[in-house]
Curated annotation (Swiss-Prot):
Cellular component, GO annotation: membrane
Protein name: WAT1-related protein At1g43650
Pfam families from the UniProt entry: EamA
Keywords, comma-separated and alphabetical: Membrane, Repeat, Transmembrane, Transmembrane helix
Cysteines engaged in disulfide bonds, as pairs: none
The keyword Membrane appears for this protein: yes
All copies of domain EamA, residue ranges: 16-139, 188-313
Superkingdom of origin organism: Eukaryota
InterPro entries the UniProt entry points to: EamA_dom, WAT1-related
Family statement: Belongs to the drug/metabolite transporter (DMT) superfamily. Plant drug/metabolite exporter (P-DME) (TC 2.A.7.4) family.
Organism: Arabidopsis thaliana
Range of residues in the leader sequence: none
Length: 343
């Protein structure tokens, strides 16, 4: 019972941390922080925070790094971290913090579709769990599109308020651009998830692998930022909210929540951790309503409902499939034992 409470509290804390990421990032970008420079500093904080723990805690799991493996890690970092995060922060500049939180609920759906395309996932439409996985993915992706592009009547409108921070209310044109960019960022992240599973089989030291990817991403982001913006003044970060946002995203989001999720997955399984994903969306919606005075439309609410329904439907299908597989394995082992006894 105590373990159950600890796992629940850990996952609630993780989602609170995740909810803070788009909110703080939005404020920092709105105050003039260059999004590409933001990614560089975020990854630098992450690499510095993870490296000592990776060195001391996983010394027994260290395995040799071949040139080919190092090259794989470099390109995975480029696609999944550097490209994904840079697109994410460009999107944050042109959309709302709520949309950024909402689209994370579509990640399982996008990952499932990509896994099917790469033949890493199988589905049986003759079984209820197979239908649930496909339907959940379709509903989740539909929810992301509805949230992004369907407005309808406004439910909460604060735009007439004089307390809105400058630059936090995107225009319609920028909202469309930001929505498409955010979906592209999530797609890159989903590709990272798929590629990560293969590399982890070759390099089992998880924390060292993440620390190495953060280091590569930091270097790549520096090159990207210099190539896009040659103005040296963009690298100067004043002590305040922008610096706090970078440290928060690097240390708290990439560092602390990683360990909490790994611990929860070991204790309760991956489905348990995924069930808490919509909590970040709810928290972000509440805070954004007061902080950024966001307008909430009926279409946004409908899209959020579809996202959450698609997430849970897909998770149910995946859980059911795993239960059937475990039952099949137990039956096979039982038959083998019976045959041995007979012989």
């Amino acid at each position: 019972m105590m373990m159950e409470h600890k796992a629940n509290m850990a996952m609630v804390f993780v989602q609170i941390v995740y909810a803070g990421m788009p909110l703080l990032s939005k404020v920092a970008i709105s105050q003039g922080t260059n999004p590409f420079v933001f990614v560089f500093y975020r990854q630098a904080f992450a690499a510095l925070a993870l490296s000592p723990f990776a060195f001391f805690l996983e010394s027994s799991k260290s395995s040799p790094l071949s040139f080919i493996l190092l090259l794989k890690i470099f390109f995975i970092s480029l696609c999944g971290l550097t490209l994904s995060l840079n697109l994410y922060y460009v999107a944050i500049e042109n959309t709302t913090a709520t949309f950024a939180a909402a689209t994370t609920n579509a990640i399982p759906s996008i990952t499932f579709v990509l896994a099917l395309l790469f033949r890493l996932e199988t589905v049986t439409l003759k079984k209820s769990h197979g239908v649930a996985k496909v339907t959940g993915s379709m509903v989740g992706m539909l929810g992301a599109l509805v949230f992004a592009f369907v407005k309808g009547p406004s439910l909460i409108n604060h735009y007439n308020s004089s307390t809105i921070p400058n630059g936090t209310v995107p225009s319609t044109k920028n909202s469309v651009k930001g929505s498409i960019t955010m979906l592209a960022a999530n797609t890159c992240w989903c590709l990272w998830i798929i590629m990560q599973s293969k590399v982890m089989k070759e390099y089992p030291a998880k924390l060292r692998l993440v620390a190495l990817q953060c280091l590569f991403s930091c270097i790549q982001s520096a090159v990207w930022a210099v190539a896009v913006n040659r103005n040296p003044s963009v690298w100067k970060i004043e002590f305040g909210l922008p610096l706090l946002s970078m440290a928060y995203c690097g240390i708290m989001v990439t560092g602390l929540t990683y360990w909490l999720q790994v611990w929860a997955i070991e204790k309760k399984g991956p489905v348990f951790t995924a069930l808490y994903t919509p909590l970040a969306l709810i928290l972000t919606c509440i805070v954004s309503s007061f902080l950024f005075k966001e307008t909430f439309y009926l279409g946004s609410v409908g899209g959020a409902v579809l996202l959450v329904c698609g997430l849970y439907l897909g998770l149910w299908g995946k859980t059911k499939e795993e239960e059937i597989q475990r039952y099949g394995e137990k039956q096979s082992q039982k038959e083998i034992i019976e045959e041995v006894i007979i012989v």
